[in-house]
Every structure is written in C-alpha cells, then in structure tokens.
Regions:
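Conserved beta-sheet core of the metallophosphoesterase superfamily
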Residues: 158, 162-252, 257
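Residues that act as N-cap/strand-start positions at coil-to-secondary-structure junctions
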Residues: 134-136, 237
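Charge-rich, low-complexity terminal tails
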Residues: 103-114, 244-260
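Short, surface-exposed basic-aromatic patches at helix termini and helix-loop junctions that form
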Residues: 92-93, 114-128, 151-153, 174-178, ...
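Core catalytic region of metal-dependent phosphoesterases/phosphodiesterases
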Residues: 9-21, 25-134
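Short, flexible loop/turn elements at secondary-structure junctions
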Residues: 26-29, 144-146, 163-165, 219
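Short glycine- and acidic-rich boundary segments immediately preceding or forming the N-terminal edge
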Residues: 1-10
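Beta-strand-turn-beta hairpins that frame and shape the catalytic cleft
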Residues: 11-23, 139-159, 210-213
C-alpha cells in the first residue's frame, strides 16, 4: 500500500546545481473532451528539455467520469482503462524529473469512494514510482546545490502539495503547516500566485521574524466548455507558474509564463 502522508518525501538534488525549477502539474483531465493536448505537450517538452526541471503532480490527471459525477461519461474521449494507460505513460516519460504525486477529487470522490480503488496509485506503481505517491498531501524536503555558508550542506526547501485547498484573503490551507517555504494546489482551474507570510516567534532566540511562503495554483489543461460553461463560470487564464529554488543561499522566485 502507499506510504502515509506524514512521511515526507526527501530529495537531494545535485550539489553542483545553482538552482532548480519546480513545475506543478494538475488538472489535465485526460479523457475529457475539453483536454488541451497541445498545451500539455508543450509543457511536457519544456520540462524534459529543462536540465534543472523537476515536476510535482497534484491531482486530476484524468477525467474518470462515473455515473452521478458532474462529468459526462458519454463525451469522454477515452475509457477509464485508456485514461490510466495515458497517465502511466506520462509518468514513465517524466520519471527522472518527478518528485511527488498526489491524486485529486476525480479519484477520491469517484473510483476510491465507489469501489475502494486508487487509480493514480496504480499508475505510479506501474511507472515504478510508488514511493513518490501520497494519497492526500505530500510534504517535501528538497535539497539543492551547496550552501555558501556551509560547504558541507545543501540549501533545503520545505513544501506542501495537495489538490484541494482554501485560499481566502485572511485564511488559507498554506497557513496550516509551520515551516514550509512553498505550497502548491489546484482544483479550481484558476491560475494564480498569492504569496503569503506569517510571523514566527523564535523562542530559542527570543526574536520575532517574518516568514514568506510562495503559494501557487497553476490552473488547468482544459479548454472552455462543459459543465463549467453550463454553470456560468468564466473562462480561466492559460497562465502557468514555475518556482525557482536557489542552491547557494535560501531564495525563491516564482515566474509566470504562457505555452501558446
């Protein structure tokens, strides 16, 4: 069975790297008639060609429509087995770049709830990445480069990813966990970067300081239409985000880009 969410995923990237690029992939919805294959292939090619690129998968990679779900089973472009085959192949193609995998509601509220199965975990196992899967939340400890202050240590970044999250003005799921440097989520198909901060009382040194947190949602790979259009939702931006973490000193940069 999959490892518990409380077990962090620890990754030590090469000590000679001066930085690493983190890409957040979620809401592909492969199998939906709205899946934007062109957008996905452009991002996939970018990740593969990026020597310093790493990817974190954050749920809803396939549509997985079932009776009673919002999705229309009769307009799917691939059946559930074919959807799993597609996602498994993406995992295989990006195995060396992948740091973590978590599912979304199109797994947990559908196949898992109705049949007790975990289709995205199956994909991870078939791709030889079962140890990178967490069922709701993945906590990350990523080391990169060589610290300027201590040549025997890497610079470490601590992150949290999960598919669904709250992101209100004065309250967010990113506030739940002390010590994280970045938080990434999806589900709402609304790309945005909403950096947060919190005050930290350093009890050991009796000082108070501010800690910054990068808070990122990379939208979706869906074209406009379907039940979103029927419900009167507005079209969402195609913007994507990449987080750069640096290796000599602790520093992060979030950059936005378009793939069209």
């Amino acid at each position: 069975m999959f490892l518990p969410d409380w077990q962090p995923i620890t990754v030590d990237l090469p000590t000679e790297w001066e930085f690493a690029h983190l890409y957040f992939v979620h809401d592909l919805h492969y199998g939906s008639e709205l899946f934007d294959a062109r957008k996905w292939m452009r991002l996939k090619d970018r990740i593969i060609s990026d020597k310093y690129g790493k990817v974190l998968f954050i749920g809803d990679l396939f549509e997985n429509a079932i009776p009673g779900s919002k999705s229309n089973m009769f307009t799917q472009t691939a059946n559930p087995a074919e959807q799993k085959e597609f996602v498994t192949q993406q995992f295989i193609d990006l195995k060396e770049q992948t740091i973590a995998i978590v599912p979304g509601n199109h797994c947990s509220n559908r196949t898992t709830k109705t049949a007790g199965l975990y289709p995205l975990y199956d994909c991870a196992l078939l791709a030889g990445m079962g140890e990178k899967y967490r069922n709701i939340i993945a906590f990350l400890n990523i080391g990169v480069g060589t610290s300027k202050k201590n040549k025997s240590k890497q610079v470490h970044y601590f992150g949290q990813i999960q598919h669904k999250a709250k992101d209100c003005k004065n309250y967010g799921t990113s506030d739940f966990t002390d010590g994280i440097d970045f938080f990434a989520f999806g589900h709402d198909h609304n790309p945005k970067e909403t950096p947060r901060s919190k005050l930290v009382f350093d009890k050991q040194n009796n000082v108070i300081y501010k800690r910054n947190i990068e808070n990122i949602d990379c939208g979706s790979f869906c074209q406009f239409g379907g039940y979103g259009a029927e419900a009167g939702y507005r079209p969402q931006s195609d913007k994507m985000y990449m987080l750069t973490i640096f290796g000599e000193e602790k520093r992060m940069e979030t950059s936005g880009f378009y793939l069209s």
